[in-house]
């Protein structure tokens, strides 16, 4: 090894030891011919001092991010010069030998100056990601990720799981998003697809008798750009045979408890649960943030006989802002703009005066009886503001759910040190395909219905006989885990019987021919004693970003993509040469298409 110690691990117990350190030059200070340098390696920082004239003369040439090796004696810092903010802050190294391992060019941004971190644009950071990762916070993010990986593996190996790698070159099968396609050079005109998840392969592993599988899996989805999404991402993927929902949930909670402990947090299990219907009714979201206690109150029945046209709608709901009646008019107007940015016409409101009198546009348009009872109905007290949404149920609840979060932010109700986990269970098995498309998802099949989770999720046992007769009422045997308003994992008990799987395909408008072509290998496998099985997949990037307190999942990915799936570091995606295009066979016609075209041409010539 080129060094004997790590810089950040030097302590008073090392005083009088001769040490060799390696690392990068951080901050440098010159004091009357004596040079002080913060030497940084993966463990942290140590102060090294150049006092001897010859070595100090050479140290004058050192600049930020030079890679160096130093040898010297560990000494106690002079009294009063200790740095309590550094683990090594009680000592320094008096350098006797200096070796420059490599020089550094002028930096595109400062690395050791935390005050400048927010001034560096993300494109620049990602273009020079290898420098960005030298920052303590960014390097620590990847080390935290490694610890989380190890913690999950520890739990799974304790339960006799087998880590298995599944293919990353497979066939294109519809799973809810667009596939990334890879041309197959040896079979011109055909393509592999990068997997959106290991879903089908892990189910086949259950058929194969592996019983307990896991994988830290890379997944790929060619989606339109959305905030804080990545075209390639990581899942902790887990599957088990001969289990029910309770077994999977218990294991998932054990994994999360162990992972959270790596960051020094203790979480209490079992986690609370709520149904999907309750989550939407009370919080306007299937991933509610439960760190604050604001709930939506349904007012549809209350206003069933109203003369106010705005409230003569399918749904009316409300949320209360504590003390919100004191907001100035400009703030109330800002709420209207906020709602319009979310596709709503506005956000109706009533102000409850300190004397209990109601004011605002809505108060003037509702009946005396409605004015007399609305505050009690929604739980508002003098000084509060009641915000309303009216319209179709789904979008109105979504608006109120967003308002709920905005109110909590404005009132400072969100405790960033708190972890609020909940399971959301009993989600619908199917949703209208039009709704899925409106949200930017790919609706599989050619039906009015598409799967909410995926096509391989089993219905709850009580809907097994009826889900294809009444798809809108069927509930999925599925469970999502939510933390602080973020969905961090989701799973289900899977279909393991061929006839049930074929019935699901029929509901989704996937013909027998298409099912056979795209999923025949899975249907065939179900014919050979497939066991009952289920599992869960955790969004690993999201979990690590939450653990580390990062604003974006990009901070916990070594080399992430920026907006639109572009990699500023390598400038990917890039064009290919004409030779590469020809060799890949990307423009070749598949044999079936070519044969069909030839047949059509022959027929037309007769």
From Swiss-Prot:
* GO CC terms of this entry: cytoplasm
Instruction: Spell out the residue ranges making up region: Aspartate.
Output: 199-202
Annotated region described as Disordered, given as residue ranges: 564-606
Enzyme Commission code: 6.1.1.23
What residues does L-aspartate bind to? 175, 221, 453, 494
Q: Where does the protein principally reside?
A: cytoplasm
Read off the PROSITE patterns from this record. Answer: AA_TRNA_LIGASE_II
Site (described: Important for tRNA non-discrimination) = 31, 80
* Coiled-coil region(s): none
Which InterPro entries does the UniProt record give?
Aa-tRNA-synt_II (IPR004364), aa-tRNA-synth_II (IPR006195), aa-tRNA-synth_II/BPL/LPL (IPR045864), Asp-tRNA-ligase_1 (IPR004524), Asp-tRNA-ligase_1_N (IPR047089), Asp/Asn-tRNA-synth_IIb (IPR002312), AspRS_core (IPR047090), GAD-like_sf (IPR004115)
Its recorded name reads Aspartate--tRNA(Asp/Asn) ligase
């Amino acid at each position: 090894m080129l060094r004997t110690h790590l810089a950040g691990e030097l302590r008073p117990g090392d005083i009088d030891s001769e040490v060799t350190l390696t690392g990068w030059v951080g901050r440098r200070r010159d004091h009357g011919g004596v040079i002080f340098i913060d030497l940084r390696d993966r463990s942290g920082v140590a102060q090294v001092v150049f006092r001897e004239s010859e070595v100090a003369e050479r140290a004058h040439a050192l600049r930020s991010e030079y890679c160096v090796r130093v040898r010297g004696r560990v000494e106690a810092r002079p009294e009063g010069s200790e740095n309590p903010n550094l683990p090594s802050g009680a000592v320094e190294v008096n350098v006797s030998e200096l070796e420059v391992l490599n020089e550094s060019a002028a930096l595109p941004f400062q690395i050791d100056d935390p005050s400048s971190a927010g001034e560096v644009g993300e494109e620049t950071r990602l273009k020079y990601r290898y420098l960005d990762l030298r920052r303590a916070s960014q390097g620590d993010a990847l080390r935290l990720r490694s610890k989380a990986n190890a913690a999950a593996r520890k739990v799974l190996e304790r339960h006799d799981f087998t880590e298995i790698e599944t293919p990353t070159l497979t066939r294109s099968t519809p799973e809810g998003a667009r596939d990334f396609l890879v041309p197959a050079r040896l079979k011109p005109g055909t393509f592999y697809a990068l997997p959106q998840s290991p879903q089908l392969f892990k189910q086949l592993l259950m058929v194969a008798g592996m019983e307990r599988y896991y994988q830290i899996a890379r997944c790929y989805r060619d989606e339109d750009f959305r905030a804080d999404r990545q075209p390639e991402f990581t899942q902790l993927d887990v599957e088990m045979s001969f289990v029910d929902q309770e077994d999977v949930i218990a294991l998932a909670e054990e994994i999360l408890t162990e992972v959270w402990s790596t960051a020094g947090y203790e979480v209490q299990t079992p986690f609370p649960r709520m149904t999907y219907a309750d989550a939407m009714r009370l919080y306007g979201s299937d991933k509610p943030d439960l760190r604050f206690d604001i709930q939506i109150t349904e007012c549809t029945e209350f206003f069933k006989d109203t003369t106010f046209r705005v409230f003569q709608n399918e749904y009316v709901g409300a949320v209360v802002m504590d003390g919100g009646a004191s907001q100035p008019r400009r703030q109330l107007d800002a709420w209207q703009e906020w709602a319009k940015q979310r596709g709503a016409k506005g956000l109706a409101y009533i102000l409850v005066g300190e004397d209990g009198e109601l004011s605002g546009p809505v108060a003037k348009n509702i009946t005396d009886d409605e004015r007399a009872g609305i505050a009690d109905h929604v739980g508002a007290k003098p000084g509060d503001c009641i915000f309303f949404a009216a319209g179709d149920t789904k979008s109105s609840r979504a608006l109120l759910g967003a308002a709920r979060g905005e109110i909590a932010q404005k009132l400072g109700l969100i405790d960033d040190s708190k972890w609020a986990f909940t399971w959301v269970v009993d989600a619908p098995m199917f949703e209208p395909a039009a709704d899925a498309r409106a949200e930017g998802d790919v609706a599989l099949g050619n039906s009015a219905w598409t799967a909410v989770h995926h096509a391989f999720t089993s219905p709850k046992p009580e809907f097994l006989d009826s889900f294809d007769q009444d798809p809108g009422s069927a509930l999925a045997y599925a469970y999502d885990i939510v933390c602080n308003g973020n969905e961090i994992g989701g799973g289900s008990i899977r279909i393991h019987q061929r006839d049930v799987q074929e019935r699901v395909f029929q509901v989704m408008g996937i013909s027998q021919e298409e099912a056979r072509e795209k999923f025949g290998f899975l249907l065939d496998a179900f014919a050979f004693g497939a066991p009952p099985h289920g599992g869960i997949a955790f969004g690993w990037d999201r979990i690590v970003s939450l653990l580390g307190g990062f604003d974006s999942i990009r901070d916990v990915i070594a080399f992430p993509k920026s907006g639109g799936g572009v990699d500023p570091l390598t400038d990917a995606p890039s064009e290919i040469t004409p030779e590469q295009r020809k060799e890949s066979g990307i423009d070749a016609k598949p044999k079936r298409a070519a044969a069909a075209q030839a047949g059509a041409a022959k027929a037309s010539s007769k």
